[in-house]
Amino acid sequence: MSKVSRESLNEAIAEVLKGSSEKPRKFRETIELQIGLKNYDPQKDKRFSGSIRLKHIPRPNMKVCVFGDQHHLDEAAAGDIPSMSADDLKKLNKQKKLIKKLAKSYDAFIASESLIKQIPRILGPGLNKAGKFPSVVTHGESLQSKSDEIRATVKFQMKKVLCLSVAVGHVGLTQEELVSNISLSINFLVSLLKKNWQNVRSLNIKSTMGKPQRVY
């Protein structure tokens, strides 16, 4: 984190948390890292994309659904995790509207190893278009830990514009936990950029309803 001092990061996080505690909301505010880029041409330069798992789950309320074989359906039922069988998916009959609705209902999907190859055939390209193609889960992994892994993973993806924002925490985390998540995120982002720090115009952190605090 060469260019962002721990001190300025601590100050910015303290301001974000203070602002949030002074005006409590009815929901738990997410804290985002907002990134402005420079010396980048989205038309010509390669658009970067990468995911990193943070130490502390930034979005604990993220809704995850399991497309399961019998083993995972039983585990999902026992753990109160939303799930669908292959038959449930076949009933959607590749109808675009229904698949769009399914994609909107959840933030992410997990599929049993035995099912994952069938998903494109059963559902068509709908989930892929929504950027929500399922992650695979084996019988050796617990659904709960897989769900937590997905909730802890954030994706940095360059689109057509020179700014992006990524959830890096929430106001229920401690200052130290947020420093850890944000430092990790900034380092990872810079490693994805062609010219590293020379491509970073600005870095701000803000809570959902709060004011942005500049850290770079």
Curated annotation (Swiss-Prot):
UniProt key word Ribosomal protein: yes
A biological process from GO: translation
Keywords: Ribonucleoprotein, Ribosomal protein
UniProt GO cellular component terms: cytosolic large ribosomal subunit
PROSITE patterns: RIBOSOMAL_L1
SUPFAM superfamilies associated with the record: Ribosomal protein L1
Xref: InterPro entries: eL8/uL1-like, Ribosomal_uL1, Ribosomal_uL1-like, Ribosomal_uL1/biogenesis, Ribosomal_uL1_3-a/b-sand, Ribosomal_uL1_CS
Domain of life, per lineage: Eukaryota
GO function term, MF aspect, one: RNA binding
Gene3D superfamilies for this protein: 3.30.190.20, 3.40.50.790
Family: Belongs to the universal ribosomal protein uL1 family.
Protein name: Large ribosomal subunit protein uL1
Organism (species): Caenorhabditis elegans
Gene of this entry: rpl-10a
